Amino acid sequence: MCFGGRGKDDEAEASRSRELDKQIRADEKRLSKEVKLLLLGAGESGKSTILKQMKLIYAQGFSKNEKLEWRPVIFANILQSFRLIFDAMNEFNIKLEDEDNEKNMVQMMVDYEMRGDEPLPLEYFEPAKKLWQDSGVRQAIEKGNEFALHDNLQYFCSDLDRLWDRNYVPSDQDLLRSRLRTTGITETVFDLGQLTYRMFDVGGQRSERKKWIHCFENVNCLLFLVAISGYDQCLVEDKDGNQMNEALMLWESIANSHWFTKSALILFLNKIDLFKEKLPRSPITNHGFTDYHGPPDDSKQASKYFMDKFRALNRNPDKEIYGHFTNATDTNLLKITMGSVQDMIIQRNLKQLIL
């Protein structure tokens, strides 16, 4: 009887062992088809926008309730932009064209804690509309690169009637244009072909970078974003700093880091649309990039100049850099770009990922 009992114990133990082995094999199979993709880059480079696009393209998008939660963010973006403009007007001694707009600017200074279930507050509608039409405000906006004015103001203020409609539900494009500063780590999971992608976005401002270290283990692919339009823009956290110089410095440390010796390095020079638009009125040689010798308004040569500049900072001749010019708010362009990224990852890691 004792032996029989022991036999049952042994059988149960063997069964548990088989289950454990089965679970381990299942986990190994799952992990072999999982791509850990880390999004890095300086602040304002468009990382959060890329993450939203992945949700739109590959993960069923945003529900109506999720979209409504972005209304307070959009309102806060508009308010914050006008406050930055007001400070800049004082700094650059720019006057409002219409003196009556003084009271409208005062209204934009009033704090308002908006809930997700309420429409944008009406008392800010006329002030926003009138200020947007003021030539003094427009003059300050022209200097937006000098005081870190976010690039979504033109988009939102050209459509204020729609935003202040009582039944307004933010569109996908509204969500892509809206700006919510990333703190900590945000993860998005989506399936693409035979692979499952786990994409991590970490805060880009200097104070957030110390948190990146926790994401570095077993990264298959590093996606580094640069706002190519930031060549003439100051940093949010340092008005004397330059976004492009900050990105070059950060890229050099990342591209040559021991953490990424086995990772694929993908470089997105993002906001190429804004870059092309501003280049004729803001030549890159005016902003410290004096080793550029191409035509001042040739966006093809100027964008290649920056891509070459980033590639040259990679000190490992055997490590390939996969470079793309992107516009993170353009869903179709990003879909094509991510298709190229997918092909590269499959080709590069075929044995580890599929076999």
Swiss-Prot record:
UniProt region (G5 motif), positions on chain: 326-331
Function (record text): Guanine nucleotide-binding proteins (G proteins) are involved as modulators or transducers in various transmembrane signaling systems.
UniProt name for this protein: Guanine nucleotide-binding protein alpha-2 subunit
Sample GO molecular function, one term: GTPase activity
Subunit structure: G proteins are composed of 3 units; alpha, beta and gamma. The alpha chain contains the guanine nucleotide binding site.
Region (G4 motif): 266-273
A cellular component annotation (GO) from this entry: cytoplasm
InterPro entries: Fungi_Gprotein_alpha, Gprotein_alpha_su, GproteinA_insert, P-loop_NTPase
Keyword annotations: GTP-binding, Hydrolase, Magnesium, Metal-binding, Nucleotide-binding, Transducer
Organism whose genome encodes this protein: Neurospora crassa (strain ATCC 24698 / 74-OR23-1A / CBS 708.71 / DSM 1257 / FGSC 987)
GO BP annotations, alphabetical order: G protein-coupled receptor signaling pathway; negative regulation of pheromone response MAPK cascade; positive regulation of conjugation with cellular fusion
Top-rank lineage group of the source organism: Eukaryota
Start and end residues of each stretch annotated as G3 motif: 197-206
Positions of the UniProt region annotated as G2 motif: 174-182
Domain G-alpha: 33-355
SUPFAM superfamilies for this protein: P-loop containing nucleoside triphosphate hydrolases, Transducin (alpha subunit), insertion domain
The keyword Transmembrane is assigned to this record: no
Residues binding Mg(2+), per UniProt: 48, 182
Cofactor dependency: Mg(2+)
Family stated for the protein in its record: Belongs to the G-alpha family. G(q) subfamily.
Pfam families in alphabetical order: G-alpha
